Amino acid sequence: YFLDKTYRKESGRSMFYEVSTEVMEEVESQLGELNGEAFQTTMTDFWTAVQELSKDPSSSVTQGLIVQRASEFVQRASAVYAGLSSYQDNLNTQIRQNVDKINKYGNQLLTLNDQIRAIESGGIEHANDLRDARNQILDELAELTNMSFSEDRYGSVSVQIEGVDFVKDGTCYEIAMKTDEATGFVTPFWPMNASYTTRDDGTRVYNIDGAEVFDLSIEISSDLGTDIGGLKAMLLARGDHRANYTDLAEGKYDSVSQSVVMNIQGEFDQMIHNVVTKINDILAEAAGVQSGDLELADGTTLKNAKYCAVDSDGYMRMEDGTPIQLFTKVTTDGYRKVTGKDGKDYWVMNEEKADSPESLYTIGNLQVNSALMQEPSKLGFRLADGSEDKKTADALKAAFTEESYTLNPNVQKKTTFVDYYTDLVSQVANSGYVFRSIYENQVNTVEATQSAREQVVGVSTDEELSNMIKFQNAY
């Protein structure tokens, strides 16, 4: 019993790290190679175009190149993010399948309990084959979940998963799944521990708060025994939503930090967001956008607004006078028109709000300015006096080499636009290496426990064969 218990705990831990290692390898391949081309190439091409622009800002060739590279940058970023999201869906499918498998095992255990009890109740026969089959199921369950088991004097086995009764007294308390309407992600929960309301058609709507099978907010560590079971590893890796840069904000980061896929989605989106907003801000400054409080005609004051006077003939402006943006949002405008207390019209930059996805410059809401795609020379880079705007072109170049960005709030090292993606991939590779080494150590532990267990439980084939020969000779 002790060796069974040890073996099952260690094999559950082994599966946790096996899944975690596979997830890291998949994420690394998503980041490294997409249709044979790494995103780093796209980033390097964009950086090269910015350097070319700084050499000859008013050339229609360099302006055309930067718009083209910006467009590729957005397309490739979308493809990487879509790949990560698709992998979340893949994990979600595996989670569904494994919950179904666990429930199937639970019902099989009930049947085997009944059969074993029936055979052994007389106290003469021993249901060895049935016990072997039951042990096999317990081994499989132990790989998927953090389970414990006990056998009563009648030969029936009870099982707990994550400390909650799963098989007990002739009942299998099946795990149910609640599907998130926005993402389709499922959360395994215990129906007997959840409250519910009943619809008119008789279907139940569950409130699963506190009834989840796994508490994913607890820190993962071997000391706490929270690193056991392949299903938990899948749930952690998938996360509970599609993350973006707002998830990396101080105070929010803990909710995504333990999920490999959400963490990378957030860090990758943050990189794209930083590049996009920095470039737009540099162009806005050239167009005369300033920061400060703006008093409006209706008596209200916009605090810390970014705004400029409406000036359709101004430098770095569109026909309607809005400051030119290289990157625009798909769902909302970059600027809105307001009337100031002085009676003049102003363009005010629309602020990003974390709780309003359509206001954000995130990967799913990004495009290159369609007017610039058609006519890159709108960028101009020629000031009112006819001179080249070298200052703005140089500012764009400098933006790529400023060491002022971190991957996430827990990382101290500052990085640049040029190196950010490489650092991101290295972080995944390093984490993957750590998971793999833990997994390999764990495999050795499982094998050692299994061989000790077999010495006690298993009969060697040689021994079995010689017993059969003895038995035949006796006839």
Task: Please state what every model-predicted region is.
Residues Y1-Y475:
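Structural signature of extracellular appendage/secretion-system components
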